[in-house]
Amino acid sequence: MAKFKFKKGDTVEIIAGDDRGTKATVLAVLPKKNKVIVEGCKIVKKAIKPTEENTKGGHLNKEMPIDVSNVRKVEA
């Protein structure tokens, strides 16, 4: 298995997709899936069903993983 070049806390730039040109911080690394989760990028709205703790339910904005081929490390 090849060494993964990103780690949590790195500053990266999105080089492909809707968020192209955005510089942000890596929140999580998923080496088995070859993806990273970047702060504030690729945000989707998830529906939350009502539960005992959250009786209303509602919507949650969540960052989704981005393939590492679409991300470039930026030297701080």
UniProtKB/Swiss-Prot annotation:
One of its GO terms (cellular component) is ribonucleoprotein complex. Pfam families: KOW (PF00467), ribosomal_L24 (PF17136). One of its GO terms (biological process) is translation. The keyword Ribonucleoprotein applies. SMART domains: KOW. InterPro entries: KOW, Rib_uL2_dom2, Ribosomal_uL24, Ribosomal_uL24_CS, Ribosomal_uL24_KOW, Translation_prot_SH3-like_sf. GO terms for molecular function: rRNA binding; structural constituent of ribosome. Signal peptide: none annotated. Keywords: Ribonucleoprotein, Ribosomal protein, RNA-binding, rRNA-binding. One of two assembly initiator proteins, it binds directly to the 5'-end of the 23S rRNA, where it nucleates assembly of the 50S subunit. HAMAP family: Ribosomal_uL24_B (MF_01326_B). Belongs to the universal ribosomal protein uL24 family. This is Large ribosomal subunit protein uL24.
